[in-house]
A protein has these predicted regions:
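Basic, amphipathic alpha-helical bundle interface domains used for macromolecular binding and assembly
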Residues: 144-235
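Conserved Walker
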Residues: 7, 70, 74
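Walker A/P-loop
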Residues: 1-26
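Hydrophobic aliphatic residues
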Residues: 12, 16, 29, 38, ...
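Residue-level signature of catalytic and energy-coupling elements of molecular machines
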Residues: 1, 34, 75, 122, ...
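Canonical AAA+ ATPase core
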Residues: 41-46, 63-71, 79-170, 219-222
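Short beta-strand-centered segment that lines the nucleotide-binding/catalytic pocket of NTP-utilizing
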Residues: 19-31, 88-95
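Conserved alpha-helical scaffold flanking the Walker A/P-loop in AAA+ ATPase domains
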Residues: 40-60
Length: 235
């Protein structure tokens, strides 16, 4: 706690001119609080749809492991399907749709461990470590001086969608596909790759979703580095 995980994600969302929602996960949160529900209107004598905060482009799922599994599942199902069913009606989620979640260490009181099947739906995991002593001094200085950054959008949603199309065109050679498959297979069968010593460190090997996401991330990294093709270093 206290490492500015939430602040970093909120800042990223503010840089993009899109809709942003923050969902604070708590033990008493219900699935309807995330995806929405039907509300009876006495005026019209009918049920009306009230959409939840999941209907945004950028979603911050703050402290996701503080909510019960059924609430986590509601969000992660929306991530997988890119649609939500409220009552008998299915609604498509907006595009782009990006979910970023923070979690506290599982040894802390009041946390629920995320099942592996749910963790698998996230593309990347970033470990936030403590700042260096110089960085911490700068944090102290800027906080005491009341310095606040003036953050304005610099990217439109349409630009992100166009960039995504370009990333999908980045060339991925068959040798790179083999390289990615070997990496993932080595997490499942380390002994086949002469890595018997790491087997006790692996609880579950990477799923096919890991291979797909690794290829997508490699393409995006190549794009950021102004290349139209993927090299092993991108992986």
């Amino acid at each position: 706690p206290g490492l500015a995980k939430t602040l970093a994600i909120k800042t990223l969302a503010q840089l993009v001119n899109t809709e942003f929602s923050r969902i604070q996960f708590t033990p008493d949160l219900l699935p309807a609080d995330v995806i929405g529900t039907l509300i009876y209107s006495q005026k019209t004598e009918s049920f009306q749809v009230k959409k939840g905060p999941v209907f945004s482009n950028f979603i911050l799922a703050d402290e996701i492991n503080r909510a019960p599994a059924k609430v986590q599942s509601a969000l992660l199902e929306a991530m997988q399907e890119h649609q939500v069913t409220i009552g008998s009606t299915t609604f498509d989620l907006p595009s782009p749709f990006l979910v970023m979640a923070t979690q506290n260490p599982i040894e802390q009181e009041g946390t629920y461990q995320l099942p592996e099947a749910q963790v698998d739906r996230f593309m990347l995991k970033v470990i936030i470590d403590y700042p260096t002593i110089e960085e911490e001094k700068q944090i102290i200085r800027e906080n005491l001086n009341g310095l606040k950054a003036d953050i304005k959008p610099v990217v439109e949603a349409s630009e992100i969608l166009n960039a995504r199309k370009i990333v999908n065109q980045v060339y991925l050679d068959e040798k790179i596909e083999q390289y990615i498959a070997d990496i993932v297979f080595a997490t499942r069968y380390p002994e086949r790759y002469g890595l018997e010593n790491i087997k006790p460190l692996i609880t579950f090997g990477g799923s096919p979703r890991a291979s797909i996401n690794l290829a997508k991330a490699a393409r995006a990294y190549a794009f950021i580095n102004h290349r139209g093709y993927v090299v092993p270093e991108d992986v």
